Amino acid sequence: MTTAHRPTFDPARGKSNTQAAGSISHTRSLPSHTKLKYRYARISTNTDAMRKTLLENEGGLKQAATKLVAEQQQAETQVQDSEKELSDEVKAKIIEENRDDDDSGSDDEESDSDDSDSDSDDEDELLRIELERIKQERAQAKAREEERLALEEAKAREEQVAFGNPLMNPVAIKRKWNEDVVFRNQTKQARKEDSYVNDLIRSDFHRKFMNRYVR
């Protein structure tokens, strides 16, 4: 590309010029870009906000699941402790009754040995039945608690799946400014049906021509 059309800002000098080479420089010869350009701070977009919301929802779901697991473990521990305490109480009661029987008179033992044995057997049987009944009640309560926790966890999971993803949430479509205009779409015409026929005799033009000039 030629530069003949450009003006000469720095004309050529002959050999008679005694000035030192490079002592005079034009403004255009000086460096113009003396500062570095830095990147601007990133502008937050809808994608960033959506990502942040999803991360927060995920963290909330994890916390809820951890809380449910902790409650379930605590309930199991309480049931085990109560069963252990109950069994200890039953054992202590049996030992105390046996001790009372041993402290009774020797004469009574000899005369009523058969009756006391039968009574102790009956009491042991009743205690055993009572213990089994209490264990069944504890097991039923534990099963109900586990079922309740499972239902709550499933409900929380369904809500997270339904409302955690912003893309699946119902979106309210903004109405246009001319939605409620009184004379809206007046110039809009109904589409006419295509009456084209690939036959000159049965075409609309031929029929109009015959009706106008022949009949």
UniProtKB/Swiss-Prot annotation:
Nucleus found in the keyword field: yes
Q: What is its main location?
A: nucleus
Q: Which UniProt keywords apply?
A: Coiled coil, mRNA processing, mRNA splicing, Nucleus, Spliceosome
Q: Which InterPro entries match?
A: Cwf_Cwc_15 (IPR006973)
Where does it reside? Nucleus
Q: Which GO terms describe its cellular component?
A: catalytic step 2 spliceosome; nucleus; post-mRNA release spliceosomal complex; Prp19 complex
Q: State where composition is biased (Polar residues).
A: 15-32
Q: Where is the composition biased (Basic and acidic residues)?
A: 81-97
Q: Where is the composition biased (Acidic residues)?
A: 98-125
Which residues, by range, are in coiled-coil regions?
60-162
GO function terms (MF aspect): RNA binding
> What's one GO BP annotation on this UniProt entry?
mRNA splicing, via spliceosome
Q: Which Pfam families match?
A: Cwf_Cwc_15
Summary of subunit composition and partner proteins? Associated with the spliceosome.
| Protein family membership | Belongs to the CWC15 family.
Summarizing the function annotation, the protein's role is: Involved in pre-mRNA splicing.
PANTHER family, sorted: CELL CYCLE CONTROL PROTEIN CWF15 (PTHR12718), SPLICEOSOME-ASSOCIATED PROTEIN CWC15 HOMOLOG (PTHR12718:SF2)
- The protein in question is named Pre-mRNA-splicing factor CWC15
Originating gene: CWC15
